[in-house]
Each structure stands twice: as C-alpha cells, then as structure tokens.
Amino acid sequence: HLFEKLGVASDLTGRHKVGQGTVVFEKSSPSRLSRSDRGGELVRTAVKEAMSETGQTWKESPALVLRRGPYIVAAGLDFAGETTPVTLKGRFIPLFDAAQPVVHEYAVGVGARGLLVDLNRFPSDHIGVVAAACRVSNEKVTNQSVTFDAIGQADTNAVVSLLLPHAPKVVTIDSKALEADAVEFKDGILRLRFPNRAERIRVAVSR
C-alpha cells in the first residue's frame, strides 16, 4: 500500500528518487538485522545514502530526541561516554518532575530520560490545559472561563498547568475557591495544586 501511494513498483529494492525525497528498500528482516553484528552498519549506510540524495549531512548524536505534536521524548545513550550532553532550548515542562516547572534548557546527558511538553509548539493564542498529574476530561474554554473535570488516585496531589494570557480572577474546585498558595501564575502559565480524588472534581478558572 505504501509503495502504491508513492507511485513505485511493489518489488522495488535499492535506492530510488521519489518526489523531493529518496526511498531505500532492502529485503532484510528488522529482527534479523538487530541480531547481526553488521545490522547497525547496514542501516546507517542505507540512511546515509538516502540523505546524500537530498543534500543532508549525517551527524551522530549521544542522545535520541523524538517529537510528536507538542511532546518530546528524550534519552541520553548509556554508552555515550564523556561526550557533551545534548541541550534542548526553548520553553518546556518536564513531565517527570512532579512540580511541572517551566524550563528553558533541558540537558540530555548519559542515561537521562525525559518526557517534555514543548510550549512553543502551541499557537500563541492557545488557552487550556497543557500538562496534568491527573486525568483531565470535558475541558471547555470560553471568553469567561476554562472548566474541566479532574480525577486521580486518592491521597496524591494533582498538579495542572494551563496556558493562559492573564492571571485568573478566581479558581474554584467543586464551586469552592482554591487557596491562594495553591494557585501560581507566571509567564503565561497557570499552575494549580489540589488533592486528587478517585471521583470527578470540577475545576473552574474564571478569566
């Protein structure tokens, strides 16, 4: 099906120009390549050849950084040795940090593991939840408010981060005002903290 969409023969092998890119296909089992001493080199060679066709340069890195939508998965290779860590720059919320801070640099060193929200991937006028240490559902954004339901494991703390252009007028949990020290607004991020419950909690942010 993929070859059909690309407009090439189904028995295609080798390297072929397709549109503005290059397709490389080798009839080798990925599982077999993973067990072969030469498997890694065969894959690297194929990728380098494809990149050369489009004027790209092969560059090795001591880290793997994958992006999907606003999310970044980052891992430092355990065998990277004394290499300089890869540093991501921007505006991120590291989801493995319970405090959900906003950081502008994130170092991916040897053995590091990170799951980040890239705030710069959201439209400049985006309003709403971008990270949460609970399950968020039924979110609704209007000119007057942001409302959503939250549910989580009992006896744990919920932390919810929202993009908001201005500090909120008031935040309520099940119609009761959230205490001031549980509400933090800085640099366009509203951070809420409240006890999780294993039942629906209604959160309302008045704008």
What residue spans do the PLM features occupy?
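A conserved amphipathic helix/loop scaffold
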Residues: 1-143
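Hydrophobic, well-ordered secondary-structure elements that form the walls
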Residues: 74, 148, 171
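Surface-exposed beta-strand/loop patches in extracellular or lumenal glycoproteins
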Residues: 78-90, 151-167
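Solvent-exposed beta-hairpin/edge-strand motifs
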Residues: 89-98, 162-177
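Beta-strand-rich interaction surfaces with strong enrichment in secreted/lumenal proteins
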Residues: 104-106, 137, 148-150, 190-194
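Short proline/glycine- and polar residue-rich coil/turn motifs
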Residues: 106-110, 182-186, 193-197
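Beta-strand-rich recognition domains
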Residues: 137-162, 200
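Surface-exposed interaction regions enriched in Ser/Thr/Asp/Glu
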Residues: 189-207
